[in-house]
Swiss-Prot record:
Pfam families: His_biosynth. It is found in: Cytoplasm. Keywords: Amino-acid biosynthesis, Cytoplasm, Histidine biosynthesis, Isomerase. The keyword Isomerase applies. Disulfide bonds: none annotated. It comes from Burkholderia multivorans (strain ATCC 17616 / 249). Pathway: Amino-acid biosynthesis; L-histidine biosynthesis; L-histidine from 5-phospho-alpha-D-ribose 1-diphosphate: step 4/9. One of its GO terms (cellular component) is cytoplasm. The active site is at residues 8, 131. Belongs to the HisA/HisF family. This is 1-(5-phosphoribosyl)-5-[(5-phosphoribosylamino)methylideneamino] imidazole-4-carboxamide isomerase. One of its GO terms (molecular function) is 1-(5-phosphoribosyl)-5-[(5-phosphoribosylamino)methylideneamino]imidazole-4-carboxamide isomerase activity.
Amino acid sequence: MLLIPAIDLKDGQCVRLKQGDMDQATIFSEDPAAMARKWVDLGARRLHLVDLNGAFAGKPKNLDAIEAILDEVGDEIPVQLGGGIRSLETIEKYLDAGLSYVIIGTAAVKDPGFLRDACTAFQGNIIVGLDAKDGKVATDGWSKLTGHEVIDLAQKFEDYGVESIVYTDIGRDGMLQGINIDATVKLAQAVGIPVIASGGLSNLEDIDKLCEVEEEGVEGVICGRAIYSGDLDFAAAQRRADELNGELDDA
């Protein structure tokens, strides 16, 4: 089970939002590269970056911070990034800069042809981000709820060749209410590619529950507010996941 620390970038700083609201941002660090180093030193095997300004603007907005993070840890672990990725040129620029994966969210829902082209051009580097509330997909930094069913879109995007899916339950993100395990497993069972859970991770109990369903195709979880607020000790959580995985592998 991959525990993936999130570094959400707003105006060059590492922040956390409450339910996607840019006006409810808590600043956790003014040095995102140092934050990246901290998580890697604590045992992170992948990092999840979000360009929040980019997500709302529709184009990259935190390039300096992203490049600083890649300079710091990009040679050591894979780094994935979402937010504001709306063109093949942007994807190419990011991959050339050292990102391992780019996450396409809103653009995938609004312009499936773009996602298909991206998967063809950059095979193995494209992750799709599906944000949903009550099974329906949301777009535009969560501000618009669509009529699309998550599972229908996920299956379509799997056919395009996406590497994996980051699934966020937006009713829970930043609220420390626990991961929506049932919805995540249901999605993972419906597709043959890995699903990364996101939104609401709060404690070791969530880690236990996620490890139990790893065989269903849930390969990782994004760690956000809980590791910044201190509600979850990241290093302890990663150790716990490794121990549980070892036990499951031995079973």
